[in-house]
Each structure stands twice: as structure tokens, then as C-alpha cells.
Design a protein with these regions (language model features):
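N-terminal assembly/interaction segments in proteins that build large macromolecular machines
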Residues: 2-233
Length: 233
């Protein structure tokens, strides 16, 4: 049976699934609209599409570090609620996606969606997860850093899953790099706690430094005035 544009349009409007998914489902159903709806439902595609316009403002940060500490990936995957962010299935999804990003050398969300995970396109795999978990999920961003033989990388995610850090360092030799992994991880933990904006004070914006200096000087002058009033040196 010929699958017309009108049929695809009607199925898309009734299910919220993508146009190509609707066309494929109608083909499998030989034009039977009800059967096509069932096919989409079985694949979770209609449910995933209907959830796609719902705000995903919670979520998790996930970090994957290779065994030799030469490559590390950090990703942020959002959910609608904190409840789902604490769901073991969602946590496993975040971990699997981050590992896949690293092993595949993926650099953009577009590349991720068209890549293959467990024998299926990641986009389809992700839609299935949305349907199963029951909330809109979004891969917001990710980044991978790497090091050569004389370098080391490591990462850390705070226990609440909301803060993650990757750090890479160049070392004097491969021997030093092999011994530095734990130290770099501790640096990541420190950065997660203190939230520094730059690596060195030399990287600070001059206007920021000037404003901080003025504020500090005013604070010291006020403190000195108070000591003078109390007759203290």
C-alpha cells in the first residue's frame, strides 16, 4: 500500500513521533494506522516525542576516566526531576553514554545521535530510555580531554552528581605521569569544592583584581578605625 504524506502527517499528529519514524511504522503496518500506532508505542517513540517539549532542568554529571588515565570524559545529562536523577537506571544511562562518547571519540551531540550503541542508533536507544524512565531527558553537553605519554588526566564527580571536574597535567616524564594520577584526582576534588575560576592568579581579569583590592583596602581601613576607637594597636 502506498504511504501518503497525509497518512504520515496524521500519525505524527496523533503520536508526536518523528516524521521518518511515522513513515517507517506505516510501512511496517502496510498502511494500517492503528497498527502503526502500536508499532510506535512498542518502540517508545511516540511517548518520547511527547515528552520532548517538557523542561529538563535537573540531571547528572558523569565522568569516565580510562584505566591508564590518558583520556577522560565529562557529560551532563538532564532530567525533569531530581527524583529521576537519583534513579539507578538513569545513572546507568549517564554512565553508559559517557563511556560511549569517550570510546567513540564523539565531539558533538549531532555525532552522538547518529552513532551506534548496542547495535542501534544512539538517538533511538535514548528515546527508548525516555519512554522507560518516563521523563524528558537531554544530553546537554560533554567534553573529552586527553594526554600524551608524559601527561595524565583524571576526574571527579561530587556525591550529589551535580558538580564534576576534569584536570589534565603535563609531567616531566612518563614515570612521573604514572605516579601523578591520584594527585590529579585530589586536585579535581579540591576544584569541585572551591570552584576556582582560573588556574593561576595571573589569569585573573585586571578589573576584577582592582575591584577586590579596593574592597579589601576599605575593609582594612574600617577595621583599623574600629581598633583606634577601642584604643587598641
Amino acid at each position: 500500500m502506498e504511504i501518503t504524506a497525509q497518512m504520515v502527517k496524521e500519525l505524527r499528529e496523533s503520536t508526536g513521533a518523528g516524521m521518518m519514524d511515522c513513515k517507517k511504522a506505516l510501512g511496517e503496518a502496510n498502511g494500517d494506522m492503528e497498527k502503526a500506532v502500536d508499532i510506535l508505542r512498542e518502540k517508545g517513540l511516540g511517548q518520547a516525542a511527547k515528552k520532548a517539549d517538557r523542561l529538563a532542568s535537573e540531571g547528572l554529571v558523569s565522568v569516565e576516566v580510562c584505566s591508564k588515565c590518558k583520556k577522560a570524559t565529562i557529560s551532563e545529562i538532564n532530567s525533569e526531576t531530581d527524583f529521576v536523577a537519583r534513579n539507578p537506571q538513569f545513572q546507568a544511562l549517564a554512565k553508559d553514554a559517557t563511556a560511549h562518547i569517550q570510546s567513540s571519540g564523539i565531539k558533538t551531540v549531532e555525532e552522538l545521535n547518529t552513532s551506534t550503541l548496542n547495535g542501534v542508533k544512539f538517538e533511538e536507544y535514548f528515546k527508548t530510555q525516555i519512554a522507560t524512565i518516563g521523563e524528558n531527558l537531554v544530553v546537554r553537553r560533554f567534553e573529552t580531554i586527553s594526554a600524551d605519554d608524559k601527561g595524565v588526566v583524571n576526574g571527579y564527580v561530587h556525591s550529589n552528581g551535580r558538580v564534576g571536574v576534569l584536570i589534565g597535567a603535563a609531567c616531566e616524564s612518563a614515570e612521573v605521569a604514572n605516579k601523578a594520577a591520584e594527585f590529579i584526582r585530589n586536585l579535581c576534588m579540591h576544584a569541585a569544592a572551591m570552584k576556582p575560576s582560573v588556574i593561576s592568579y595571573k589569569d585573573l581579569d585586571k578589573d576584577f583584581v582592582d575591584k577586590e583590592f579596593i574592597a579589601l583596602r576599605a575593609e582594612l581601613e574600617k577595621e583599623n578605625e574600629e581598633l583606634k576607637r577601642l584604643g587598641k594597636p
